[in-house]
Design a protein with these regions (language model features):
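Polytopic transmembrane helical bundles with strong interfacial aromatic enrichment
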Residues: 1-250
Length: 250
């Protein structure tokens, strides 16, 4: 597998590969999110306890899941960049950070909207909510460090170390409802047990979970490609690419 991946450690090859994958990820994201959101908001049955207010689950759960998934992906990329000194991994981690921050903010916002009618408050210092808020601060810290130094290697090293250390927060988010007595409900979907919601509610939720994943992949590739161009602007292949685009524009 490494022999297959190794050629794509070169900026030009990575740029070309991401360009080929980007349309597919974009189409899949659009299809999954469109069908899943319309199905969940308009056609899924109401919850017998929460009524229609439960429908925010179709945004809240995918964003919460991928707020952690994006962070883990970012930390892995940062680890590869630190250990094997692969510059593209640092660029990938930098590209992921703002997307993860947005997902985390959406999870917190939708959680507050959902929590108001359920708990009677927009915010409570619940273990999972607090850990999710810390996750947002970690994302913002990583983003700040990437822009805090003029030297990109120093910036990537500092941001990468914070990203890796912050992984310790992910188990706290995931297992908080099991470790402590919290207001937050348990997992809707588990690996080894039957889901706690009906299939009519589950399928649109799964579509949106996949949709958020494909959207993350698509936006990451757009940002990653821009990072490559900015860092390789002096390379002949980038100049050739810019000249070709200029000719097509004329």
């Amino acid at each position: 597998m490494w022999k297959w991946l190794h050629p794509y450690a070169k900026p030009e090859s990575a740029y070309q590969l991401s360009g080929k994958l980007l349309p597919w990820f974009s189409i899949l994201a659009l299809l999954c999110l469109s069908v899943g959101t319309v199905w969940g908001l308009a056609f899924a049955p109401s919850d017998y306890q929460q009524g229609d207010s439960f429908r925010i689950i179709y945004i809240h759960v995918p964003s919460a899941i991928w707020s952690m998934g994006v962070y883990m992906s970012m930390a892995i990329a940062a680890f590869i960049g630190l250990v094997w000194q692969i510059r593209l991994s640092d660029l990938a981690a930098s590209a992921m950070a703002p997307i993860g921050a947005v997902y985390t903010f959406i999870a917190l916002l939708t959680g507050a909207v959902w929590g108001k009618p359920m708990w009677g408050a927009w915010w409570v210092w619940d273990a999972r909510l607090t850990a999710e808020l810390i996750l947002l601060f970690l994302y913002l810290g990583v983003i700040a460090l990437y822009h805090a130094f003029d030297d990109q290697k120093t910036a990537s090293k500092a941001a990468g170390i914070l990203a890796i250390v912050g992984v310790a927060n992910l188990p706290i988010i995931h297992f908080s409802v099991e470790w402590w007595n919290t207001l937050h409900q348990g997992a809707t979907i588990t690996k080894f047990e039957k889901p706690s919601i009906s299939s009519d509610m589950l399928w649109p939720l799964l579509l949106n979970i996949f949709g958020f994943a494909f959207f993350f992949g698509a936006v990451t590739m757009v940002r990653f490609r821009n990072e490559i161009i900015n860092n390789e602007s002096h390379r002949p292949w980038v100049m050739k690419l810019a000249a070709a685009k200029s000719q097509r524009g004329n």
